[in-house]
A protein has these predicted regions:
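N-terminal redox-cofactor-binding region of secreted/periplasmic oxidoreductases
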Residues: 1-257, 263
Length: 265
């Protein structure tokens, strides 16, 4: 998002990121993928509550604590949301969120080596590649699935999303191709983007019900930063609501947690 915003030369952008650099080989080397998602240095370390349907087990919920976020610690498998989900959103009232509306944006981000150009992007910053298919087990797996009554597809990010077939991966020239590599690092070269690493956001600062700034800790020091245009809370599906709740935005029912709720959502 910061990359797109800095394309407009009128604006400068600041990013507050609690994590650090992604230079380590455990992040950039695809075969080391299991390490960063299990390291406190790169992972927030969230876990679920005991799951009743799983005999009380507690599951790990890795979330990236490094530039690039979870795209720097995930398994690098690239899967779009299902087209029918986007269409359902639009049918439910989210105008402009149907799959025909979002498809151009998927294509704009992609630089995919496979797939039909009517469905896949070929010139975007996010490289998407296929692995080698010379192992006979690859074809055997797909054939076994077909014999069991499942569908097969050559491109699950194309026209037919359902089925067994080759995987798309965010890997380029043998390295992980994260959001940091695809978007952040090129944007940092423009001098329109300032990145604050090791910056732990505490809350959004409001004035007259309008977000004006951010309160954060930076290397142990309390700091505040103010925006002249907009503030975007893009901390992921767990940390974004957490920040908003600490800022007084959320359900009134959370007041028993000593969270001030000034703006009910």
């Amino acid at each position: 998002m910061a990359h797109r915003l800095t394309e407009d030369k009128k604006y400068s952008v600041a990013i507050l990121e609690f994590g650090g650099n992604d230079y380590g080989p455990l992040i950039q080397m695809p075969s080391a993928l299991s390490y960063p998602m299990n390291m406190n240095l790169y992972n927030w370390g969230y876990h679920t509550e005991p799951e009743e349907g799983l005999n009380g087990r507690i599951l790990a919920c890795p979330r990236g604590k490094v530039i690039g976020g979870s795209s720097s610690i995930n398994g690098m498998i690239y899967v779009r949301g299902n087209a029918s989900d986007f269409d359902y959103w639009e049918e439910s009232g989210a105008s402009g969120w149907g799959f025909p509306d979002v498809l151009p944006y998927f294509k704009r981000q992609e630089n995919s080596e496979a797939g039909d150009e009517s469905w896949r992007g070929k010139n975007g910053p996010l490289y998407i590649t296929r692995g080698k298919r010379d192992n006979p087990l690859n074809e055997a797996l797909v054939n076994s699935a077909k014999e069991a009554g499942f569908l097969a597809t050559e491109d699950y990010n194309g026209f037919q999303q359902e089925g067994f077939g080759p995987a798309d991966r965010t890997i380029w020239k043998g390295s992980r191709w994260s959001a940091a590599n695809a978007y952040l690092k090129p944007a940092l070269k423009t001098k329109k983007l300032k990145l604050f690493k090791k910056a732990l956001v505490k809350k959004v600062i409001f004035s007259n019900n309008e977000a004006k700034g951010i309160s954060f800790n930076h290397y142990g020091l309390h700091k505040e930063i103010y925006a002249s245009k907009e503030i975007i809370c893009s901390a992921g599906s767990i940390n974004s609501p957490l920040i908003l709740q600490r800022s007084g935005v959320g359900p009134v029912s959370y007041t028993h947690l000593t969270l001030p709720t000034n703006r009910e959502v």
